[in-house]
Amino acid sequence: MKRDAIDLSTLKVFPLFRKYFIPTLLGMLSMSAVTAIDGIFVGHGVGSDGIAAINICIPLLMLFTGIGLMVGAGCSVVASVQLSRGKSQVARINVTQALLFVTIVALIPSLLMMAFPEKTALMLGSSETLLPLVKDYLSWFVPSWVFQIWISVSLFIIRLDGAPRLAMLCSLITAVINVALDWLFIFPFGWGVMGAAFATSISIVAGGVVAIVYLLFFARRLRLCALKWSAKSIRLFARNIGYQCRIGASALLGEATLAVLMFAGNQVFMQYLGDDGVGAFGIACYYIPFVFMVGNAIAQSAQPIISFNFGLGDSSRVKETECIALLTAVVCGAIVTAVFTFWPSTLVGLFLDLDDAAAQIAVGGLPLFAVGFTFFIINLTAVGYFQSIERVIPATAFALMRGCVFLVPCFIILPQLSGTPGIWYAMPLSEILTTVSIILFFLYNRYNPVHRNNQTGTANPHADTQM
């Protein structure tokens, strides 16, 4: 299986970043396309109720994906640092432990949700009207979530192993299969929401299998390995996973921010505008993961370069990489904002007939929502930087600001001040406030020498005592 020749310590930073960024971006956009394709076919095959039903289920998927991103990001940072020090076996052990852990974490709640789909749907905020559709979607979608969490973790590892194009291929396979099966199951077969869920499940399983097969048999430096099992080994396993989760916690919080955004937005739109409002917000929520993945692609493309050179102690390459990443974030954010500002009707029309009440609400709301996209991407990039140099506290703090500290109050206060536009402006204001906080933090570090000198980061103190 072909790999890219990538030397993280000597190649010029910009070409190196580009080599990671382009396939990572394409792969991540393909991952976002999986649920968006569901929405497009369901919108035309079932209607706005189908979109609303899927949107109610998505926060749970975001939570599972977030756990995968947390472990994957933490594992990737640890493995990068260990590889920079020549400790490839320690890196392999961390990778294997990470995948074992997420398998257990995904399997147990998935089984519970499959056993109690109605209770799960009601817990997520489904109305009685939408309940049958939400149950159908959950029943057929949940079984694939173990594979989804495998994909979330494995793509970090595959890129670090020097195969960013293969990581992109895993995502493309998932998206292509989903497009074909969505059309087949929703239109010729007439299976509606259930067909969309079944198509997505099959496509996710295919992508997950490709990723795991690579790590089992074809990986160059990070192939999965056998683990020892003893009381001491289990203690070390728990400690290593705890360290990975600590480093990657901000990645989980980033995904949790999307879940909070969708869950809180669903409740507020239901309160102010009913099912049509949820359907309109559902269209926005189909696009939000694309924006999230742009920011995530920038952060994840910079992460191997930053973490590896951080492990080597090469601060100049670390700073250069972050400058390139932030500039990329600003450019990408401006492009995305322009698209949503000038062509909302085109974007909404992919999902619903523009005469639909939900579509009309969405056309008016998307330009307001798009005000926050540049800040959204910048914040993800900045949080990814802190995560890559093992600065857990600022990474976690800024992720919490986006997801809880600012977002929830904005959803509560702004609609009371300005009605429906206030709901759309909640996310942008939250992201702007977070960006301001990050800038102030950077300025404080820059102009406070004592504080700056204490911020060199720390590698895993237990690196030499892995299982």
Language model feature labels by segment:
Residues 51-111, 148-167, 270, 280-342, ...:
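Small-residue-rich hydrophobic transmembrane alpha-helices
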Residues 19-38, 140, 151, 174, ...:
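Transmembrane helical elements of multi-pass membrane transporters/channels
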Residues 72, 141-159, 167-178, 196-212, ...:
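Short runs within selected transmembrane alpha-helices of multi-pass transporters and secretion channels
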Residues 8-46, 59-74, 78, 103-110, ...:
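N-terminal transmembrane alpha-helices
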